[in-house]
Amino acid sequence: MSNESKCPFSGHNSKPQVTVGGGTANLHWWPNQLRVDLLNQHSERSNPLGKDFNYRQEFKKLDYYALKADIKNVLTDSQDWWPADWGNYTGLFIRLAWHAAGTYRMGDGRGGAGRGQQRFAPLNSWPDNASLDKARRLLWPVKQKYGQKISWADLFILAGNIALESSGFRTFGFGAGREDVWEPDNDVNWGDEKEWLAHRNSEALAGSNLAATEMGLIYVNPEGPQASGDPRSAAPFIRATFGNMAMDDEEIVALIAGGHTLGKTHGAASADHVQADPEGAPIEQMGFGWANSYGTGVGKDAITSGLEVIWSQTPTQWSNYFFENLFKYEWVQERSPAGAIQWVAADAEAIIPDPFDPSIKRKPTMLTTDLTLRFDPEFEKISRRFLNDPQAFANAFARAWFKLTHRDMGPKARYLGPEVPAEDLIWQDPLPAASATPSSASIADAKAKIVALGLSTGELVSLAWASASTFRGGDKRGGANGARIALSPQREWEVNKKAVETLTKIEELKASTQLSLADLIVLAGNVGVEQAAQAAGFNITVPFAPGRVDALQSQTDVESFQLLLGLADGFRNWKKQGVNTPAEVLLIDKAQQLTLTAPELTALIGGLRVLGTNWDGSQHGVFTQQVGVLSTDFFTNLLDMSNVWAPVDSTSEVFEGKDRKSGTVKFTATRNDLVFGSNSILRALAEVYAQADGKEKFVQDFVAAWTKVMNLDRFDLA
């Protein structure tokens, strides 16, 4: 066989091969290209279960306690390919659950355990997730047995709970309901660093949407900032990272100590022995990564973090030894066999059992960040209290662990299973119980009273949008249910100023109707949409699902809800002062949080503009002479080549559209508006509605997208 005729897959042909998805990508040429593709993630085309699959219904068929028993059996069924420390995978499964949940950040609500993302890159290959590929594979026989009745996302967290329970610990409870997705969440910004373990400063972390001090870590470097080995300097980094998950000092101490009461770290030898992570490993590794050439590569020779630390005398049984050892001994810095900085109790006896040889004992060891709980003054106070009151520690850890593993699930209405705690917790955004569903007659009566108020279409629609559009698909917070637009902090938001003026009039109707204020607000928006459609020549009824309730101020964590404001709401042409991110980028961010597709985004912007819903009443993007009519004027005028656009100043935030021949100013617009003419994908969608046959389709699509947003938080309708 000549060289020219050799098989192109044999490795002997040096010619580059043309492959699907290969070649130079668009983002190479245009690195600032708008990521409209983020709105089309997790489509039906990537989901093997089909659009009719209902996880909540499947879970109800599950023998929950049989599942728990099977997971518990896995804990002590040590496998030769990854032998269990002390014959028990308790520590490994706790770490699996912790690291699945620990990517959550309250700033934008993204990350967390709710979608089973640890199965995919980058999380499956983060340095801090080394060896968790083994934990997931240990659970595969259980997942295989129970199939779609239990998601991977739920299984990860439940395995952590069962590991704790098997150690003798009493957990606070467990709520299922996390639905798997089938591809990575590419909308999550993990940071701009281009190297693993690149360091971030604590000031930049505080209040940011980043959840770790270094790229590829879950929280902080266990060796201290930049591996400094300084416990005191680690304190602000610990507070910043845990604070971005809404954890206070007591929860931080409880979580660190509780997580380090069981199990161990692994650092038998230099990281030079460790090969590629799962995403970069050879195909024959079958999804495993971090192959280890040291000794057997597993068991006593395992290398994960490079640290070799065991905290407790009973590493598979719950105890208070973490705090007892922390305060009892004098700690001396040492290096692990892998060369990492850790600490050993210099004045202790060898009281720690070896994980594989019962004849060997070790001295207690700690991480640099463990010692922070002793040497930071505020953490030390809490730690001493837990030292002297083990039950208080256990209670605090149980609650903090539950919060850690459920924080991204949204309201308790989403929880499934027999172990859901009865207690309502403020971070769950609790709501009162719903009363009787209003009758059709009472809904019709309420609609008539709304019409009688004489409010404009824009006023009605703006109020409903302001109420519903706080929803975040990441952590399922916000939305119209609860009518929290009537409460602090939303009532005081600048962007809601005009909406609140309308709200005061809707509030006056509540006493004379059978509807909650939350329902009245949405119904008012529906009335506005119906009036606008009728004015455009289409008689439609906007679907309305009553049953919303009104939250109390005491059920609303003001600081936590303030985060739902975000940086911009391009649907209302609002952008927070001082924010430099281009408005169109923030519009995509907002649309993605609202779980909108690109066509839904396009329809909503076009409709909201012609209905006159800008937050400040401005005319930016209102490309029509018939404000309040659900027409396609936004699209036809945007794409009209008789108009020419130019920025009004050097900021390029606001633009004037002039008649190309006369120079007369016809319209003004923001970047949120013009992007539907400038971006090739959004322009293609805008053209659909600007066509002569696009009017009816536009009304139908707008109503469908509108109804979707109004019901985003109606988990009771699923």
UniProtKB/Swiss-Prot annotation:
For this record, the Gene Ontology CC terms, alphabetical, are: cytosol
Q: What class of enzyme is it?
A: oxidoreductase
Tell me the residues linked by Tryptophyl-tyrosyl-methioninium (Tyr-Met) (with W-98): 219-245
GO MF annotations in UniProt: catalase activity; heme binding; metal ion binding
Is-annotated flag, keyword Membrane? Answer: no
Task: State the reactions this protein catalyses.
Answer: H2O2 + AH2 = A + 2 H2O; 2 H2O2 = O2 + 2 H2O
Instruction: Name the keywords, alphabetized.
Output: Heme, Hydrogen peroxide, Iron, Metal-binding, Oxidoreductase, Peroxidase
Q: How is it modified after translation?
A: Formation of the three residue Trp-Tyr-Met cross-link is important for the catalase, but not the peroxidase activity of the enzyme.
Q: Which GO terms describe its biological process?
A: cellular response to hydrogen peroxide; hydrogen peroxide catabolic process
Q: Which residues form the active site?
A: 99
Q: Which Pfam families match?
A: peroxidase
According to the record, cofactor stoichiometry and binding are noted as: Binds 1 heme b (iron(II)-protoporphyrin IX) group per dimer.
- Residues given in the record as heme b binding sites: 260
Its needed co-factors are: heme b
Per the record, the covalent cross-link Tryptophyl-tyrosyl-methioninium (Trp-Tyr) (with M-245) lies at 98-219
Which E.C. number(s) belong to this protein? 1.11.1.21
Which parts of the sequence are marked as the site Transition state stabilizer?
Answer: 95
Q: Give the record's family classification.
A: Belongs to the peroxidase family. Peroxidase/catalase subfamily.
Q: What role is this protein assigned?
A: Bifunctional enzyme with both catalase and broad-spectrum peroxidase activity.
State the oligomer form and interacting partners.
Homodimer or homotetramer.
Q: What is this protein called?
A: Catalase-peroxidase
This protein's species is Acinetobacter baumannii (strain ACICU)
Q: What is the lineage of its organism?
A: Bacteria, Pseudomonadati, Pseudomonadota, Gammaproteobacteria, Moraxellales
Gene for this protein? Answer: katG
